[in-house]
Amino acid sequence: MKKNQIDIVTMGCSKNLVDSELIMKQFEENGFHCTHDAKRPQGEIAVINTCGFIEAAKEESINTILEFINRKKNGQLNKLYVMGCLSQRYKDELEAELPEVDKFYGKFNYKQLLTDLGKADVPACNGVRHLTTPRHYAYVKIAEGCDRHCAYCAIPLITGRHHSRPVEEVLDEVRGLVAQGVKEFQIIEQELTYYGVDLDGKHHITELISRMADIEGVEWIRLHYAYPNQFPLDLLDVIAEKPNVCKYLDIAFQHISDHMLDRMRRHVSKQETLDLIAEIRRRVPGIHLRTTLLVGFPGETDEDFEELKEFVAEARFERMGAFSYSEEEGTYSAKHYKDDVPEDVKQARLDELMAIQQGISEELEAKKVGKTFKVIIDRKEGEYYIGRTEFCSPEVDPEVLISSAEKSLRVGKFYDVCITDSDEFDLFGEVVQ
């Protein structure tokens, strides 16, 4: 157990990761040494940043807390603190059930931890934080909360209403990260296309991304978590025209059946969805779309699911994730719908949908063989350097494997790579001399 060392454990999404990075920087400004390795904790203090989005995430967060409680009981830890979404939503219950935790903090008051440790809240300068990602890329959270209130989603119950950061504040953060050596920026929020509406009633995502792309040193910008309803079409022109805005868009469609879209309270129709996809592909040739779909939502019929399968087969998304419905306490669907799709049916539908997508993904990736792409190197792993094209977001998308026997490459540097082969998950390539 190392004195003045704090182990930070982050559960859940990249938005949580940004919060962890910010508080790590605050701790370091106050003389602490911070680590971000849950597998090898050694500090006298641990801070667990929890996720409370779905049941599986809650269970993972609780199990992690219990692991650290055992460390504390065994004398391997002096203080244990919990923050994040789970404690934001269930603080009272957690305090009653887990008295071994020294204190619980919510999603927005975690900086109080500094005061409780007798330390000062040091204002972050231009978003400077302790990056836990490879030094060449960072996540930039441009807003918190969500105003959409989809029937299945607990996010508004946890994070509250949509709250955009001012444009200049975000741009200052990006400039600060560029000064730290960051080249690639993953732009994240719960509903990216709503950005700015809460400030003055207008969409500002297009302005933000356009101005961000003009900052010297910004090599790649990638957009995550758009929403199809009221999608600002002028954003597509920025993606098409700015060479450092990746031709990549993460936009969750969730379903295609009008019956399901209505019950999910998505405020978009099947035809509007199909029209939007066609317009995206028309305006941005070569764009890679990542989407998320939900199966087994209450009331989903065999006909609804058949419609969803046809949609996946015809839309041919480059990237797709899918989940089966789990009832979340307090949501509209939990209050008004019976969870009437059996679990085995949910799983069968999920497996069938992903099998369709797997075939599409393999076919689309195979078409890249023989073509040359700009690739950033993330790391060296065994006999390969591992990199990504502009069409691949970290952690979730296919990677490019380049033999380390070929030549010495530098992590964080861009190379032109000719794709020589592909398999179920990844691409293989050689650096173009």
Describe each PLM feature range.
Residues 1-195, 234, 249, 271-279, ...:
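Proteins enriched for Cys/Gly/acidic motifs involved in redox and nucleic-acid/cofactor modification
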Residues 78-84, 89, 94, 179-305, ...:
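Conserved SAM/AdoMet-binding glycine-rich loop
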Residues 102, 183, 219, 318, ...:
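Short acidic/polar active-site loop segments enriched in Thr and Asp
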Residues 147, 244, 256, 380-382, ...:
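Short strand-connecting beta-turns/loops that link adjacent beta-strands
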Residues 170, 187, 223, 251, ...:
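Conserved, mostly hydrophobic/aromatic
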Residues 189, 225, 253-255, 291-295, ...:
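Active-site proximal loops enriched in glycine and acidic residues that flank catalytic Cys/His/Asp
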Residues 333-433:
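Terminal RNA-binding accessory module
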